[in-house]
UniProtKB/Swiss-Prot annotation:
Textual note on the cofactor: Binds 1 zinc ion per subunit.
Co-factor requirement: Zn(2+)
Record function comment: Catalyzes the attachment of threonine to tRNA(Thr) in a two-step reaction: L-threonine is first activated by ATP to form Thr-AMP and then transferred to the acceptor end of tRNA(Thr). Also edits incorrectly charged L-seryl-tRNA(Thr).
Protein name as annotated: Threonine--tRNA ligase
InterPro entries per record: aa-tRNA-synt_IIb, aa-tRNA-synth_II, aa-tRNA-synth_II/BPL/LPL, Anticodon-bd, Anticodon-bd_dom_sf, TGS, Thr-tRNA-ligase_IIa, Thr/Ala-tRNA-synth_IIc_edit
Domain TGS, residue spans: 1-67
Catalytic activity: tRNA(Thr) + L-threonine + ATP = L-threonyl-tRNA(Thr) + AMP + diphosphate + H(+)
Origin: domain of life: Bacteria
Listed Pfam families: HGTP_anticodon, tRNA-synt_2b, tRNA_SAD
Subunit composition and interactions: Homodimer.
Family, per entry: Belongs to the class-II aminoacyl-tRNA synthetase family.
NCBIfam families assigned: thrS
Amino acid sequence: MAHLIEAAPNPHQPFVVTAGVAVGAAMRELELPNKGPEAIVCVKDSEGTLRDLSFVPEQDSKFTPVPANTEDGRTVIRHSCTHVLAQAVQAEFPGTKLGIGPAIENGFYYDFDVAEPFTPEDLQKLEKRMKKIVKQGQKFERRIFASVAEAEEALKNEPYKLELIRDKGNVDPGSDEATEIGAGDLTGYYNVNPRTGEVDWYDLCRGPHVPTTKYIPAFALTRSSAAYWRGDQSLAGLQRIYGTAWESKEALEEYQLMMAEAEKRDHRRLGAELDLFSFPDEIGSGFPVFHPNGGIVRLEMEEHSRRRHINAGYSFVNTPHITKGDLFKKSGHLDFYADGMFPPMQLDGEVDEEGNVVKQAQDYYAKPMNCPMHNLIFASRGRSYRELPLRLFEFGTVYRYEKSGVIHGLTRARGFTQDDAHIYCTEDQLEQELTSVLDFIISLLRDYGLDDFYLELSTKDPNKFVGSDEIWEKSTSILQRVATKSGLELVPDPAGAAFYGPKISVQARDAIGRTWQMSTVQLDFNLPERFNLEYTSSDGSKKRPIMIHRALFGSIERFFGVLLEHYAGAFPAWLAPHQVIGIPVADSFSEHLEKVTGMLRDNGVRASVDTSDDRMQKKIRNHTTGKVPFMLLAGARDVEANAVSFRFLDGTQINGVPVDKAIGVITQWISSRNNKQPSEETVKKLV
């Protein structure tokens, strides 16, 4: 009935199932785990498609088990948990209509058309109901609808599901709606009571799902919010419930602890507390304003990056924020990215005194990307092979129309500044240039204190690409070699590339283990053709350059938010808006500290003295909360000895440090761009 491809049973080991036998039955024969974190929740066939354990192959087939504690396993658990949630909502709130409920990163959500917004008390009530459903061990049964009419009849009381059924075949495979409909059969999943055999609840869904609700060992509802049907503000308003589900109670608790820490580190909260930036309603959603404190941090970030780029051979350019629409027609952005662009402005039109149009207005757009303008710089004159590689770099502000529901502080904004580079090189230079770019990216990110990375390689979507198979295969092979040489973990992203070329993305883990996509290195076979970019080769012939898109931070704003959360607001001294604060024990010692901070300012250090009326202990508390890395205290003994006392954010202290020594320690710490917070332990070695 089934046999393992290798010798001993293993929850990750492929096995073969005989035609006509259910996968789950074959697994039981092999004694693969059905409980605990390694319980097999579904399988993956030879084409990479996830299948229910109830799946019956028509011919002998190989399958790979998917344990609960893998990313695929967790995704299936979370998707199944959305069905449990929706069943609970319709039981507790009769008359509720169902939207969609996909698994998302670290959790899930489900949208509902309900009379009133959900309250925290409602979520508690729903969790209790869900636990009862899980305890029942309801079976997930997949049923194929024989026709659209049959599906419509089954879901006749669910208007949003009916819309999805009628849209079958026209849904973006990458959208949340694709969870329920897409290519292949039109299917539903029925939750069957194991005791009575009766259907307790059902939903339109493609699956796969866990065998029974008992395979959902740990979950929690986290919050609710307003949402729009299919993410469109012009459509019906819905209520969304978010949750998370894991393979064990221990994994759930670990995640909840991480989320509690993440909440403390939320850059939006820290931005307000530390007076770094704000989002004024008068300006509009998704447009941050940096205050003086945040402006200093941003300036330091940009200046260090600028110096590193100059040393690495990049040429700085600058381009305008808006341009004629014809440029984005030429680049293809209006064909492929129009939904992500702000509406056009009509400019340059003229009318006479009688209102007759003398000159037609033209469409101008706020730029969503810098690359078309960089191509115009390349094409502004003839180029020789001797000029290549040509590396054009810009801190270029771009504007993208993000839906209001996805805007998230600095990490998902509508207006942001990219550290954007476009590199033009010959085919022979490509591998060396990619190696240099990747080394430069990792080195620069480490300068800012990130040091835990892995790479993701996005390869060709066979249904959506430009250029020949040969050039895709060759360039993908080069990217893979470059990534492998870096020594970093390489994770494949099959068919994940944009249509114009393969891509490497650099993923960074922060201080609490979260992953952020930081940098991208993208090959482009499309724009050099569209812009007819050429250079003169050594034999005098005209050739097309290869183009590399490269954004290191992604955007300055996003990177600012990532660093703010990574450091929990306590930026390294070289980035901190206030590097040194003088705190006198009494007012009479302020003059001594003014001299010390004056000498520090002469050395380029941001230093000042707190001369407020607050008591010393309150000043220490205030500046500890304000995350000032160096606090210098001075009392009678310090003044007499021409010394200061160090106070650090961790509460430790070093007393009686001579002023010259203190200034040397501080300037050395800052100029070396030390990313650790100073403390008694680390500074005492330098005193």
